[in-house]
Every structure is written in structure tokens, then in C-alpha cells.
Amino acid sequence: FPTRRSSDLVMITGDHKDTAVAIGKELGIISDASQAITGRELDALSDEELDAAVEKYSVYARVQPEHKVRIVNAWRRKGAITAMTGDGVNDAPSIKSADIGVGMGITGTDVTKNVADMVLSDDNFATIVNAVGEGRRIYDNIRKAIQFLLASNMSEVLGVFFATLLGFTLLNPVHLLFINLITDCFPADR
């Protein structure tokens, strides 16, 4: 499950609280029933109270579609990037409210697939976990490439900039192209 880099997994279900707690414990989402709350208990909370308590709960049981939207919005108000998965018409409003809505491709309804930002073709949660990991690797690689290019080319940029200010030519365009070819191509192969 996505536990690295402060990813929080939350289970929101229409199932009975005891069932949801048992599944949550089995999956390692929660350690005890105090981390679960029901839709009826959510009704008693104002939006401000929910905002204060949303991080305390990882399992939400017996919830209605409007509860799911409230939960997603509470996480968003906390500054979290939210992703919501679902397959039924009742999941569509919360999938639409989330930053990233994920519909199920096999069991999902057409409504859910249409409002989703992404459709999971195999209905497998592990695919989402793998995609998040791959996305993080791509992001890290892009960041490293930009750092390398800035670091390796900064001397060229500064040299040409100050030479231009002082009124003389430090490097011709052909020289710059040759330097870039040598310094940027070989490290790119690694």
C-alpha cells in the first residue's frame, strides 16, 4: 500500500462498521476500531469538526455519497492531494470532487467511468500503487536531469553572459554546440 512519502490510504465503504474494521485491520489500514467512523457519526460533525478529525480516521463505514464528498473535501482543505476510486453511480460525486478520480474499467458503471480522470482497466488496486511508484520515479528522474543540465551548463551561461556584458566574444556558437554535445550527450546515455 502507498505508505511512502506520506501517502495515506483511507477506506470509505457502505459496509457495516464491524465488517469495515475487520477488512481495514486485515489490510493494515487501521490497528483498532477507534480509527473507524460511521456515516451517522459524520452527520453529527460540522465541516470544521470533520476537518479537525479527518486525519484521525482511516475507515469510514455505512457512508452515503454525500459523506464521501465531505470526506474528500475535508482532506483537500487539509492540503492533501486526493485520489478516489469507485465503481458505482454512488461513487461518481466523490470521484468528481477528488483531485484524481479513478473509475473501475471492468465493474464500473458508465457514469463513474465518464466522471473519472483515469479508468483502471484491470480493476486492481495494486495497479494504482505501481502507477504512483512509477510516477514518483519519473518525477525524480526529471528533477535530476534538470539539476544536471542547470549545473553543467551554468558555467557556459554565466561565461557568455558576462562576456557579452564586457563586450567580447568568449565562445562562438559552434564552440557552444560542441561543448553541449560533449558534456550533455555522454551522461545522457547512462
Predicted feature descriptions by range:
Residues 1-6:
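Short, small-residue-biased leader/transition segments that mark boundaries at the very start
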Residues 7-10, 57-59:
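Short active-site oxyanion
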Residues 14-17, 37, 88, 108:
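Residue-level "edge-of-site" marker
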Residues 16-27, 66-71, 88-98:
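Acidic, divalent-metal-coordinating active-site segment for phosphoryl/phosphodiester hydrolysis
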Residues 31-83, 98, 103-190:
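Membrane-embedded transport module
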